[in-house]
Amino acid sequence: MGSSTPSNELPALQEAFNFPDGPQSMLPATTFLIGFVLGPLFFAPLSEQYGRRPILISTLCLYIIFTMGTALSPNWAAFLIFRFLSGIFASPPMSVTGGSIADVFVDKVVRGRANMLWSSATLLGPLAGPVIAGYTYQYSWRWAFWASMAFSGICLIALVFQPETLATKILRDRAAKLNKEKGAERYIAPADMDKPGLLVTLKITTTRPLYLLCTEMLVALTCVYMAFVYAVFYMLLKIFPNIFHGIYGFTPGESGLAFVMMFAGSLISNVLGYFYDIYAQGLVRRHPNKHAEYLRLPLACVGGPAFVISLFWLGWTSRLSIHWIVPLLSMIPYGFGYQCIFMAMINYTADAYGIFASSALAALAACRSIAGAIIPLAVDSMIGTLGIAWSCSVLALISCALSLVPFGFIIWGEKIRAASNFSKKLQNAPHPDLELTRSVSIV
């Protein structure tokens, strides 16, 4: 929600801070997403070491503080600085939550459904931001940030009552409690045996996402695909005003209908995802020795073409001679395709990398945030040079090429993993769930 909130109140921000149209109009989203790049690289691996709950609560508190700073910004520079800091501390849920889901749900089918609901929320947030801003900007551009801050406060209250999910942290706390009760250091959690020093731990945990990105082809290709899909969303935040305001004369609030259509498409994908999970569960029972994570990918194989079609549809129907409902309806297959791609690729990555899911998801989050921050800066130049129709066509053609990624994983995924030293070690290691749920040991 925080990343896209300013997109529908740019006229009010330009009036308040007196900055020119063009690339600067994308800076509220860009600075936020740059923070999104940095956050997961540190917070996700640290959550694997020190627990999910402390990271989520502390960063959400700081996010609320910096969102308040954004709402109170006296000038353009302060606004952008607070947006950057907000982005850093808004990032942990994008990667840490995936790790929490992997902690709680051992069954891969149930975990897939939980990830489906979570990925729906990650789409609903960016969709809700412009809709809220479209109606609040007429009072003040600050109101959208007050609304975001209030919603975050509600989330913080709920988070306080959430228990820790990381098994190693639970065992560490249990050992500490027993030692306190006995008055002696008699108990130690398995994860603390031969535990490296703090600096070594930080080095390992903060470099692991980068290591996976550079050495794991599955992670790298998934990052490229999801990064481009994510960047297209932020490009549409700039393209929509050119279409619905520039061509059809919509108000910012009315332009929010496009985001409602996106959400309708995502709901359809969730229904499909639920019934596909039931089908996949049957396949797992019949073929228990197969890698179940590959059953996640067919959703992306369906979503990719829908995503491509929606961009062609939007670009070539956005003209005065065609009723506004036609380009608006293109956002239904867009939302469907976007959600299917994210559901499938996130679930596939989480299943494939097990206890290191947070690190792999952190690499995904960082790459898509970089793409979402940088690529949309070219939107104005692209539209000015190519026009709306051909701009959307270029995006559709690139998406078409990248939509082959999940098909490639289905065909060659096992060979790719067989050639990966990291995947070999992960598969040959003791089962992580058994290893992490042992009782504390007496020394």
Where are the regions that the model predicts?
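Conserved MFS/SLC helix-loop-helix module at the cytosolic interface between two early adjacent transmembrane helices
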Residues: 38-77
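Central cavity-lining transmembrane alpha-helices of secondary-active solute carriers
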Residues: 27-44, 260-273
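Interfacial helix-cap and linker-helix signal at transmembrane-aqueous boundaries
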Residues: 13-14, 46-47, 69, 79, ...
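Cytoplasmic helix-loop-helix junction between adjacent transmembrane helices
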Residues: 82-122
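Extracytoplasmic
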Residues: 1-22, 38, 43, 93, ...
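Intracellular terminal tails of multi-pass secondary transporters
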Residues: 1-3, 7, 11, 142-143, ...
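Extracytoplasmic gate region of multi-pass secondary transporters
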Residues: 6-7, 204-270, 341-347
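Helix-breaking motifs and short loop linkers at transmembrane-helix boundaries and internal kinks
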Residues: 17-18, 42, 50-51, 72-78, ...
